[in-house]
C-alpha cells in the first residue's frame, strides 16, 4: 500500500482517493490500442472537476450527458469541438445552454425539429450528429425498442424533416451496452456501426464527418472472476475500420472510454465508528457506507431478493458482486467474521455481509477498491443529512487537488 495514500485516507476518511498515475496509464493503454481514434471520456462516470481537468490535459474529449456536463467539460479545458452532448430528452433550455459550447447529438426526430426551430430563431444553420437506434443488437440479433436514438428504419422520415430545416447531419453516435469484456462482441458492434454510418450517409445524402462508436471499454473488476478485454484482438476490428475510413471518408473516428480511465484509479475509504454484537452476530459500523458508496448495498439487496443467487448486471446501478473488493486495515494477527454496516437509519445500509478479515477496532480504516467510476457520483449522499465524503485527486509526486 502506498504510504502517502494511507496517510491521506487517515486524514480525510470518509473519502474517495483517485490516483492520477493509474488514470494516465489507462489512457496510454487506450491510445496504444486505438492510435487512429480520438477518445471521449464519459463524464457521468466520474465528474469530479480535478479528474476531468486531468483527463482533458491528457487529450481526451467528452461524452456529455447533460448541459452541466458540457459546461463542466469546457471549464476543465476541453475544446468545444471535442465535447459531444448526447442524451435523451434534452430540453430547449439544455440545448440553449450547450449551443455554443459543444457538438449536439440529436436523440429523436422531435429533437431535430426543435433544433431546427432554434436555428430559425437564431438565424443560423447548424450541423448536428444523430444518435441511432440500429437495426442490429449487441452480439448479433435484431435491434430492440429503446428510449435512446432514432430508429434506423426512420431514416426516410429524418431525411424529409431535414429537407425542411436549416439543419444538416454530419455524424452519428451508436451506444448499445456498456461494460462488455468480449472483444468480438464489442468489435462486432464497432464493425456494424461503421456499416450503419454508411447507410445513414446514403439515406441522408450528407457528409459524414465523424462516427462515435460508443459503448465504452469494459473493465475487469476482479481477475479471479473476469477476464480483461483482449485489447489486441479488439484492435483488429478498429484497424480494419480505420483503413476503410482512410480510403474513403477520412472522417473523425471516436471511441468512448467509458469507465476505463478512472474505475480502477479510485479507492473509497471509511472509518470504523462503532462495533457491537447482537444475538450471536458481530457488526462493524462505519461512517458513510450506503450514503458514501451505494452500489454494494444494492448488490446485497439484489442477493436477498434472489435468495442467494447471483444477480445479472444492471448497469450502472449493479455491476457484479465482486466489483468492489474490500480490505480491512485492522489487526492482522486476529481474524473475525462481521457484517460491515453504516450509520444510516435503515437496515439496507450494508457494505458487506459475513466479511472475514483482520479484526477491526474503532478508528480503523476500511478500503474499497475500483471506486473511481459510477461510485461517488451514483450515490444518494443527502439521506439523513450526513456530511458527504471528500474527493481528492492524488498525483504521484504527492500533489493533491480537491476542487
Mark where each language-model region is.
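A charged N-terminal "starter" segment
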Residues: 1-120, 124-126, 164, 168, ...
Amino acid at each position: 500500500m502506498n504510504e502517502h495514500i494511507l496517510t491521506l485516507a487517515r486524514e480525510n476518511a470518509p473519502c474517495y482517493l483517485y490516483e492520477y498515475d493509474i488514470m494516465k496509464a489507462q489512457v496510454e493503454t487506450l491510445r496504444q490500442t486505438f492510435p487512429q481514434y480520438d477518445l471521449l471520456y464519459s463524464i457521468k462516470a466520474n465528474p469530479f472537476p480535478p479528474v476531468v481537468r486531468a483527463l482533458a490535459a491528457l487529450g481526451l474529449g467528452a461524452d456529455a450527458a447533460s448541459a452541466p456536463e458540457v459546461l463542466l467539460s469546457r471549464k476543465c479545458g476541453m475544446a468545444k469541438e471535442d465535447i459531444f452532448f448526447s442524451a435523451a430528452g434534452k430540453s430547449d433550455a439544455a440545448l440553449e445552454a450547450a449551443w455554443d459550447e459543444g457538438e449536439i447529438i440529436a436523440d429523436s426526430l422531435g429533437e431535430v425539429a426543435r433544433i431546427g426551430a432554434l436555428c430559425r430563431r437564431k438565424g443560423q444553420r447548424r450541423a448536428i450528429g444523430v444518435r441511432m437506434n440500429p437495426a442490429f443488437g449487441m452480439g448479433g440479433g435484431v435491434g430492440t425498442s429503446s428510449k435512446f436514438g432514432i430508429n434506423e428504419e426512420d431514416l426516410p422520415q429524418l431525411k424529409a424533416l431535414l429537407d425542411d430545416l436549416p439543419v444538416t447531419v454530419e455524424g452519428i453516435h451508436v451506444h448499445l451496452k456498456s461494460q462488455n469484456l468480449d472483444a468480438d462482441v464489442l468489435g462486432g458492434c464497432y464493425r456494424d456501426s461503421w456499416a450503419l454510418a454508411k447507410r445513414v450517409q446514403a439515406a441522408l445524402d450528407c457528409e459524414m464527418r465523424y462516427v462515435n462508436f460508443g459503448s465504452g471499454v469494459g473493465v475487469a473488476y476482479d481477475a479471479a472472476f473476469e477476464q480483461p478485454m483482449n485489447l489486441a484482438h479488439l484492435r483488429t476490428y478498429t484497424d480494419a475500420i480505420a483503413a476503410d475510413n482512410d480510403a474513403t471518408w477520412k472522417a473523425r473516428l471516436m471511441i468512448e472510454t467509458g469507465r476505463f480511465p478512472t474505475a480502477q484509479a479510485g479507492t473509497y475509504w471509511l472509518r470504523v465508528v462503532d462495533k457491537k454484537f447482537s444475538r450471536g452476530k458481530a457488526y462493524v459500523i462505519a461512517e458513510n457506507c450506503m450514503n458514501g458508496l451505494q452500489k454494494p448495498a444494492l448488490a446485497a439487496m439484489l442477493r436477498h431478493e434472489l435468495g442467494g443467487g447471483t444477480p445479472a448486471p444492471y448497469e450502472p446501478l449493479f455491476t457484479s458482486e465482486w466489483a468492489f473488493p474490500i480490505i480491512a486495515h485492522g489487526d492482522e494477527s486476529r481474524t473475525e467474521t462481521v457484517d460491515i454496516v453504516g450509520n444510516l437509519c435503515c437496515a439496507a445500509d450494508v457494505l458487506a455481509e459475513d466479511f472475514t478479515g483482520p479484526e477491526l477496532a474503532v478508528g480503523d480504516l476500511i478500503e474499497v477498491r475500483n471506486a473511481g467510476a459510477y461510485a461517488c457520483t451514483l450515490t444518494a449522499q443527502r439521506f439523513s443529512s450526513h456530511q458527504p465524503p471528500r474527493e481528492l485527486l492524488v498525483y504521484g509526486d504527492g500533489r493533491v487537488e480537491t476542487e
